């Protein structure tokens, strides 16, 4: 502590200057505090504006949905009103291609931006007791790029790119949140004994034995809506990897009732309904495969509609880009009948076939204020083009390893630049 009693006590002028200096100092502090508060609020505003400027991105991936399985693409036996509405509000692609003819490599191409000649996962290599061969730790995924750009990242549905806890686990590949099937083999069954919530196995007691208490796509959908609600004030990347209408043909009875007897002649399918392999990969029996298939498409279409309604309810629809597509062509397993529904449209081949019917898939994109409503394009694009397209939308750096080419100019109506 320092003091100068003689100076302060003996010099009135000095005292006046000291008092004046103290007054100026206090006033300066007051203004500084006020300005600091204003700068803090301004920073918050700038941060909020920056987040608002970044569009939310939702990528909905159906599983084994054929080019002809939507009424917007020519389906005649049933309708998909919510997905059709999405097409009317956005752009419909007529020449979009999946990453591969089957699940895991198609997803790998999507998330790495590399075609199947370069991306690590090139087949459905199974790991026991659960999961598939993982993508390596040094893989730079779309989710990691999104996270680096300030996005909350979530995947809901089927993963298939690395068994639980592996380097390919979704939480090790850029996703903040995961809920659903880690193993695509177990995704053959719609009433599973467990699902994964991040790194925790969630046992579904309601599905123990032969019970059918929880229809997994519905539970996953509810968690998807929760993710949107939770992140409504921040930019998010949501990857909805639906298992519909993959493999087993199964739907809740209240939905099946709407379609029973409407698609004759019905075809019965005999599957595995008990024993050690029950709900461990093989499909259950289904007496009315046509009605079951349409019921599943009904559920998928409704879920798309509910996602769009949630965006509207939260007031974020205008700042959200939504893409809808499928991972490959229609399948023939579990009693599925693509010939009856003309699921592959005018094309030859189905899932696993390297023909147009096996790899040409729907793609619909809605982005209010950017993508002109009710438009079509014959621009040729594929799954590995999605990464650079999203990079352009979110102002992200694109790694040189990508094979894809952004189709953002096409979305913006700038075909000449494309």
Which ranges hold each PLM region?
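Bacterial Sec-dependent N-terminal signal peptides
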Residues: 1-52
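Short, structured coil segments at secondary-structure junctions
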Residues: 171-174
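Active-site segment of extracytoplasmic enzymes that catalyze sulfate/phosphate-ester chemistry
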Residues: 59, 67-154, 164-165, 177, ...
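Basic phosphate/pyrophosphate-binding loop/patch that engages nucleotide-derived ligands
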Residues: 147-150, 414-418
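Conserved beta-strand scaffold positions in the cores of enzyme catalytic domains, especially
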Residues: 155, 178-180, 237
